[in-house]
Amino acid sequence: MFQGSIVAIVTPFKNGAVDEEKLRELVEFQIENGTDAIVPCGTTGESSTLSYVEHDRVIQVVVEQVNKRVPVIAGTGSNSTHEAIEITQHAKELGADGALLVTPYYNKPSQEGLFRHYKAVADAVALPQILYNVPGRTGVNLLPETVARLSVHQNIVAIKEATGSLQQASEVLALCGDKIDVLSGDDFITLPIMAAGGKGVISVTANIMPKEVSSLVDAFNAGNLEEARRLHLYLLKISNAMFIESNPVPVKAAVSLMGKCSSEVRLPLAPLMEANLAKLTAIMKEYKLI
């Protein structure tokens, strides 16, 4: 259902507030350059530091600006199941086409707890939902066997696999078959995951190079493996640079260097350190992005 090059879009700020004008411009930049779907309020969108009102407003602005040209998949995860249900329902009411739900963080649920959490949200809200597994941030790993149990639910349509492990992604693919789609959650392994049967990527790099990320996915789907491999290797350095510090600090700096919005992030995130900003600037010049 949700396939291809999907951007986890940044949330631009200006003087501490959401910069709606720049957000709309970023949406246009994505659509003009071939992005297949947009995820507002994900990790890259700094969802954890948005108020409930801001969270709803960011989704609303993106839905309005997209105007049904591509799917909008709202980040609606929480470490409270009740809250995740409420946020997902709000996203549906605002016109989102789907929801991306990160595994509950900090409280470290068991696999049974994770299963019950996701099932409860999927039972409560009739909206296509993507599981989001990123144990490096959440402290819990949604194991392939649990994904397989969830894959039979009609409202669970995909998983964003951000373990960085090709083995785990492959195990999910082997256990789930075509019941759900597997999307790479790490730009640097998009091509290997697609080669194993994945359907695309939820990308950080697409914030600055949407055309190239989209072209990689399209080349693979067209059977042009040589071009897909070329783009995979070409994007590797810039994709790694997006994690020179904690996401989304580097990508916010990169988008700012391109003149598209402020690099402002919210505490407890801090601006990119000067030494890393110099490294990022040099890499972006190599790619002729600035």
Swiss-Prot record:
The record marks T43, Y106 as: Part of a proton relay during catalysis. InterPro entries: Aldolase_TIM, DapA, DapA-like, Schiff_base-form_aldolases_AS, Schiff_base-form_aldolases_CS. The active site is at Y132, K160. One of its GO terms (biological process) is lysine biosynthetic process via diaminopimelate. The keyword Transmembrane helix does not apply. It catalyses: L-aspartate 4-semialdehyde + pyruvate = (2S,4S)-4-hydroxy-2,3,4,5-tetrahydrodipicolinate + H2O + H(+). Keywords: Amino-acid biosynthesis, Cytoplasm, Diaminopimelate biosynthesis, Lyase, Lysine biosynthesis, Schiff base. Signal peptide: none annotated. Its EC number is 4.3.3.7. GO terms for cellular component: cytosol. It comes from the Bacteria. It is found in: Cytoplasm. Pyruvate binds at T44, I202. Catalyzes the condensation of (S)-aspartate-beta-semialdehyde [(S)-ASA] and pyruvate to 4-hydroxy-tetrahydrodipicolinate (HTPA). Homotetramer; dimer of dimers. NCBIfam families: dapA. Belongs to the DapA family. This is 4-hydroxy-tetrahydrodipicolinate synthase.
